Each structure stands twice: as structure tokens, then as C-alpha cells.
Amino acid sequence: MAQVSTVTSQAGAVISHDVAMRFLFVGDSMTIGRAGDFTWRYRMWQHLEATLGDGGYAITGPRTELYDTEANAPLSHAYGDASFPAPARRHLAGWGEGWLHMAPVIADAVASARADVLLVSLGLIDLGFYTDSTQTAANARAFITAARAANPRIRLVLLPVIPNIRAESDAPFAAECDRFNTLLAKAVADLDAPASPVLLASHPTGYDIHTDTYDGTHPGPTGEHKLAGAFADAMHQAWGVGGPYAGALATA
């Protein structure tokens, strides 16, 4: 299945959003962020504010914290912008958590948050520490099934794995990342449905782990913009939601 830079999940489909869309951000350390980060979630909030406006959307989820690297726990609320509204900080993301961890909890999270759109960035931690590409893809399918059990009309946008710096020196790991992305695309093609569309976002345009991350894995400000842009452009191109991402591709 081609990525949504060129096609939609259901060709030509436009998602009606007469009522406020309820977004849930799901991810690992790249999504939760660490103390002092802005996070791509913050960049997406800015985009939603600009394109859907007050009352046109809500951000949901059971967590609001950033990861505190000194405490080795998600205890921080020190976002890069202290004025980031508390309700918009909500998410379901965890440092060291992947598809393996999120598949068992997503149904309860969707039900309790009343989420209807999931923006998901998972897989790197699975492949790095927990499961091979085949099992990781199986867990992604289980995640989608569980989310639909809680909301049969749930909509999902999935980001492919972005190989980190480890892939430059670990050829088997790099191959597993590539294979998982192929399997993820197949899962999207298999599971996409009119009542519950699933999109595979494009790899963020121009994303460079040497300049868009602070350590070869986790996004800095430019990387945050590019991650948010991948999700935003997928929804706009495929569903007519919001508009093209216009966030500044520069440091905050």
C-alpha cells in the first residue's frame, strides 16, 4: 500500500467532523518526551488550534507527564512552553513502551478517553529490546483490534518506524526495522475499513537523525515539527481534516 503522501486509506474519502474530534497520542519515548522538551504533541496541538480551532477538537488520554531522566520515571511537568494548556498535554505514551505494552491497554484507554482518532508512533523500542519484526507486527494488529473493540469507528494514523542511530552500525537491526515497516504497511492494507479507516503516514519529509534529534533517536525541535507534520499531512491529504502542516521547521 502506498503511503498517504500519494493515496488515501479509502480513496477520496473525506472524514466528517461536525462534532469535536477527540485525539489520543500513543507512543514511546519519542512521544512522551523528557523534561524540558516541547514534544511533537505540543507541535500538533498548535496545528490543531490553527486548523480546527477552539471547540473543533479535544486532546485526550490518561497521562500528562514528561519523562524525568534523573528520576527514571514519568514525573515531570516541565514542558518547553510552560503555557502549554494542561488539557492539551494528555497522552498515552511511555518511555520504553511499545506495541507490546500498548496493545493490552489501548481498549481501556480509548473507552475512558472517548477517543475517536489515534495518532500512533510505536515500534522502535519493540524491535530494539522486545520482539522481532513478525511479532511486533502481530502486536500492532492486536492493538488495532483492541482499539476497535472499544470504539468500532475509531480512526488511526500510524507512523512507520524511523530507524535510529543504532541502525547505522547494526545491520540486522536495520533490516528488522525495514521488514517491520513492510509488515506494518500490509497490516494497514489488510485492516483499513470504511467505518474505521487506518492510515500509514509517510516517513517525515527530510527527517535526519543527525540534525533532527538530540541523541540519534529522540526528536529535537526540528524533529518534533517534522513528526507532527507527518501526522497532520496524512489526515489532511486522506481525510480532509485540518490543513497542510505549516509549523516552522526551525528551532523553537
Predicted regions and their residues:
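Histidine-centered active-site loop/cap adjacent to the catalytic His
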Residues: 23-26, 212-252
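Short hydrophobic segments within beta-strands
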Residues: 26-27, 159
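Sec-exported extracytoplasmic/periplasmic mature domains
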Residues: 31, 45, 49-53, 111, ...
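Active-site segments of SGNH/GDSL-like serine hydrolases
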Residues: 119-128, 144-179, 202-207
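Active-site cleft segment of glycoside hydrolase catalytic domains centered on the general acid/base Glu
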Residues: 128-143, 168-180, 213-222
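Substrate-gating cap/lid alpha-helix
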Residues: 163-202, 221-225
